[in-house]
A protein has these predicted regions:
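Structured adenosyl-cofactor binding patch, chiefly the S-adenosyl-L-methionine
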Residues: 47, 52, 143-144, 163-171, ...
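Short, acidic/turn-prone active-site loops that include or flank metal/cofactor-
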Residues: 65, 86-89, 155-156, 224-226, ...
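RNA substrate-binding interface of SAM-dependent RNA methyltransferases
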Residues: 62, 119-206
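N-terminal positively charged helical leader segments and presequences
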Residues: 1-113
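Active-site/ligand-binding-proximal alpha/beta "capping" segment
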Residues: 198-252
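Short glycine/serine/threonine-rich phosphate/pyrophosphate-binding segments
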Residues: 133-137, 228, 253
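Short basic, glycine-rich beta-strand/loop surfaces that mediate nucleic-acid
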Residues: 96-107, 171-172, 214-222
Length: 268
């Protein structure tokens, strides 16, 4: 049996998202969180990552039962697995992490450029949504409804690792995260390319059903509590609301995004 795995020590990071600092004078990163490595755990995130030809792997830890299941799922593995006890993975994660006997260390996926988005794309843009559970759930919905990408800001976005990857349940391998320095500038660029920029807010000026949807389309979602920032809102062609008949009129942002994606898919 291999010796217990010891992860790299994180460098001091202050309040930087992702927990890693950049060297002095280095250019801003091109991925959310500026991470040096991604940690994935759980069956779905690990299986989908191992199937992704664009991933570069560093280390795979697996319990005996999990390794058997992994080989049944995908056959030959692209990285050699190290057999460990469940407790060894437990020590690497928070107590509430459900790892199912799998822990994968790999390189972060590259972030594509805005210019690479197709001319008929439906994409999401997240305005400083920082909760990794929400962003992961949004990625999962984006994969389910065929969104081409999710645009996030380099700062004020969770790193594409750990909790986010677990919440995405493998969707991180199918929907690229496009990391931009300034969301407003990105929306201006997309507008020049002909994208319909549709913001969402519970107090939106128009009901979603009244908007003439077309492609290319970028749907802009704001953080819970803060909503869309002023410049973001001003750059949207419409700010729509979801009509809900019940006593609670405000939805979790990941739920609202799923509903918006479903509505857009039905009106193609």
């Amino acid at each position: 049996m291999a010796p217990p795995f010891r992860p790299k020590q994180a460098r001091p990071a202050g309040n930087r998202p992702g927990g890693h600092a950049r060297r002095a004078g280095a250019p801003p990163p091109h991925r959310p969180g500026d991470i040096d490595e991604a940690v994935l755990y759980g069956v779905h995130p690990v299986v989908e990552a191992l199937r992704n030809p664009h991933r570069r792997f560093r280390r795979l830890l697996a319990t005996e039962n999990a390794l058997r299941r992994l080989r049944e799922e995908i056959g030959d593995l692209p990285v050699e697995a190290e057999l460990v006890r469940p407790s060894e993975i437990d020590r690497l994660l928070t107590p509430d992490s459900v790892h199912q006997g799998l822990y994968l260390v790999c390189e972060p996926l590259p972030s594509p450029d805005l210019d690479s988005l197709p001319d008929d794309a439906v994409v999401l843009a997240l305005d400083q949504i920082t909760d990794p559970h929400n962003v992961g759930a949004i990625l999962r919905s984006a994969a389910a409804f065929g969104a081409a990408a999710v645009i996030v800001t380099i700062r004020h976005s969770p790193a594409a690792t750990g909790v986010l990857a677990k919440s995405a349940s493998g969707a991180l391998e199918h929907v690229p995260l496009v990391a931009v320095r300034n969301l407003g500038d990105a929306l201006e660029t997309l507008g020049k390319r002909g994208f319909l920029r549709l913001g969402f807010d519970s107090e939106g000026d128009v009901a979603l059903e009244e908007v003439a949807l077309r492609r290319p389309l970028v749907m802009v979602m704001g953080a819970e509590g803060k909503g869309l920032r002023q410049r973001t809102r001003e750059l949207c062609d419409h700010v729509a609301r979801l009509e809900v008949p019940g006593a609670i009129t405000s939805l979790n942002v990941s739920n609202a995004t799923a509903i918006a994606l479903y509505a857009a898919s039905r009106r193609r």
